[in-house]
A protein has these predicted regions:
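Phosphate-binding site of ATP-dependent enzymes
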Residues: 1-53, 57-60, 81-88
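ATP-dependent carboxylate activation and anion-phosphoryl transfer catalytic cores
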Residues: 12, 49-140
Length: 140
């Protein structure tokens, strides 16, 4: 699973989490290795996580990771689930790629587009939070 988290200008202690994405592996694959990730001839896709309970769990762990690691702006959290339903953090990428060509979309692109505000909303969230952070620095 992937969860994109961005700063929330209204409350920097409560970041905004986008609808999570689940990687749909091509037949015969169980791991997102270099050929799956970068060979555009290997068919894979992402689908939006729609289960409310799983979404809440993914959001909770991703937002906590974002805060604990001191990320600002945005970060993409990579999380996996075992057969018992336990979630495991792989990483948080504080500068995950975005705005790839549609045929090469990465997980962050899908999550941004799951949100009705799309890229415009994504960048507005980041810019508004940056202004808040700058005002806080200036006041210190």
């Amino acid at each position: 699973y992937n969860v994109l988290v961005v700063d929330n200008a209204e409350n920097l202690n409560d970041p905004f989490a986008y609808p999570p994405a689940e990687l749909v592996f091509p037949p015969g694959e169980e791991f997102w290795h270099v050929d799956v990730k970068w060979n555009y001839n290997v068919p894979f896709d992402f689908k939006q996580v729609t289960d409310p309970e799983l979404t809440a769990r993914l959001h909770d762990i991703a937002k906590k990771l974002y805060q604990v690691m001191g990320v600002s702006g945005y970060g993409r959290c990579d999380i996996r689930m075992n057969e018992k339903g336990e979630l495991y953090i792989l990483e948080i990428n504080p500068n995950g790629g975005i705005m790839f060509k549609p045929e090469e979309y990465g997980p962050a692109d899908y999550m941004i587009l799951y949100d009705p505000e799309g890229y415009k909303g994504f960048f507005e969230r980041i810019f508004r939070a940056a202004v808040v952070r700058q005002k806080m620095r200036a006041a210190a």
